[in-house]
Amino acid sequence: QSGFTGGAINAVTKSGTNEFKGTAYMYTSNTHLTGNKVEDYELTRNRDHSTTYGASLGGAIIKNKLFFFVNGEYQDNVQAGPSGIARSGANDEWSTNGIVHRPFENTTTVGGRTFVGMNNISQYLSEKYNYNPGRYQGYSLETPSYKIMGRLDWNINNNKINFRFTHTHSKYSSNPSSSTTPFKDSIIYPGGVDGSAGKSSSGRTANTGLYFESSRYMQEQNFTSIASEWNSKWGAINNALRFTYSYQNEPRTYEGGTFPTVDILDQGSLYASFGPDPFTEGNLRQVKTFVITDEFNFSSGIHNFMGGIQFESNKAVNGFMQAGSGYYVYSSWDDFVNNRAPAAFGVTYSNTGDGSQFLANMKYQQLSFYLQDQMNITDNFRLTAGVRFELPIYPELKNNYNKNFAQIDFDGYHYATDQLPSSYQLTASPRIGFNWDLTGERKYVLRGGSGYFIGRLPFVWLVSAVGNANCGQSTYYYNEQKDAKYGQPSFHTSVADMLKDPNLNLPAATDPAAPSGATIIDRDLKMNATWKSSLAFDAKLPGDIDFTLEGIFSKEFNPATVTNLGRKFKGEQEIAPGDVRRMFEYSNANKTDAYYITNAGNSAYYYSLTASLAKTFDFGLHLSASYTRSYAKSYGDGIGDQVNSAYYNNRYSVNGNNDTETGYGTYVSPNRVLASAAYRIKYAKNFASSLSLIYEGMNMGYAGGYSAARYSYTFTGNI
């Protein structure tokens, strides 16, 4: 196997038999099954529910020859919306509980100052621009999903063929992004509200403001897979020819229709947002994968040989336009209504010439061949050894050379936006495993193995080399009016009108400006790999109790990471007695960033030790319990769909983000206890019911988003 360095899921689909069988099922949960009270504090709880309906049917079309199986599932989901609400009057307190926010429902005057109401903003946009920004509080969202699967099995003679089709569609609603990239929050949101302590937060989703429903987005997830397998027998040789095609399509959608992203400030902090999330317009991911594998196996004496050859082709398409519908930041509602120059502005536009969206795409192929021998050394001892060879093939990045960027001097070096790793770098990944029945009765079993596994590079990073080169699309923005290099536009509802604004003087598409944050790929970039070893002991204890003790150790090699060629080490500075910091500055006169996809060091690792007990009783009761202790050091786990977010966020940094360092693994739970009890009752001849109780206790390992997350005293900036 190949293509992963973490966990793998082995999915086996049902098939039809000579007997017609059908099933139907339903699962449900709703608002009332979710708690909303912590001690004496009651949380806002919007309506939500999820009900799953499913059915399957299988049987024979031709007895003993041709079988079918189909399954369908539909989820009726209603997702709770945001919990924040507006003030209904001047006497309402805000910010004290995180629920009531600063904006008012209707225009209100407090202390001689007038605050525009959310209802009044909606009314103005409807009358002026025929635009409905949607709701802003007290709403839920429908996010239905469905899954269908069909399978045919044909027993010809010694040859057997099966065909499988699956399609899933789902979507979920997300809050608007808190990021303002490429803007700088500290500049466009200078902050400060009424001078009150605890009320000076200035982010896009802070409680100083509220956003309309149009600022949310629906992330769709569509996955289609077609697979076929032909099993044949040629004398002593068994052969399996497999074909798989998969299509992953993940567009974003939003309410309200095309409109610019607009942030209205009040005293330097966000007051109201409407229009789409700034990263949603034109945002999509598409990955098409084609795999063909021919695999054989045969036995000779104690040897069971298996070998094969595989060809894989991937095409990744990424649509990403920061401020793709325009992004305006106004210092006040009055500035917006009177069409004054925006305090900050940004837009990404296509260079195709016909106004159509530019879609970055990249192709990647890989040829693999492998051989394995499973040797039955004795009746009690089995040894398996194998090796896999892989040859990656990268195509050229056509029409992706930005000559203006290539002229920038990065501390004595120049880089090209169309460079790629060298193709035809053959890699070998050996692996070995054993299974030893110590007594010959399967009472005590020792098993383990060790192997070197080649993974995959993050395609969304690689394809950004196309999207961020300013060849297919260009981005213009300014954080402050004094930095408006190409001018300040009036307000327009379409990008086409923004580009025609006489106040803007953007570079011609035929001579695109150097990007301010290009993606550069290391010519020597290698596939990430993991060396993984495991050792386990299984025992049947007195009382027919199953006991397992298992240890796992893995070490990372060549994990992909992102550094910034636009920054260089300046020197050390003592900012306080005994507190010496490394300082950095731009490496070029243009003050341009260049995000460099390269390999980190080889110091990341993971280990775990698990002990488990399980027992099944004759009367239908099953009990199990396990404890896992795990530990990991990583280079940041590659978090971030964008190279700039991967560089700045979730990085373990003491000496700057360009000095890749290890820190605690992001998703590893140091301690985890799992216990379960299941009881199955049979009745009325053909019926049975099962009741299960599951307990899980663990330390959260995620880098952010949970109050129980691991605390760290390693930061990415000065404290």
Where are these regions (language model features)?
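Hydrophobic, lipid-facing positions within transmembrane beta-strands of outer-membrane proteins
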Residues: 5-7, 51-55, 146-150, 222-228, ...
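Acidic, glycine-rich flexible loop segments
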Residues: 1-8, 14-211, 218-224, 233-236, ...
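Transmembrane beta-barrel strands of outer-membrane/channel proteins
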Residues: 24-30, 70-74, 163-167, 241-247, ...
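Residues on the lipid-exposed face of transmembrane beta-strands in outer-membrane beta-barrel proteins
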Residues: 11, 55-59, 150-154, 228-232, ...
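Repeated loop/turn-to-beta-strand initiation elements of outer-membrane beta-barrel proteins
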Residues: 65-66, 159-163, 236-239, 303-305, ...
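Solvent-exposed loop/turn elements at secondary-structure boundaries
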Residues: 397-429, 433-599, 719
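Short, solvent-exposed micro-motifs at the edges of structured domains
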Residues: 394, 516, 526-533, 539-719
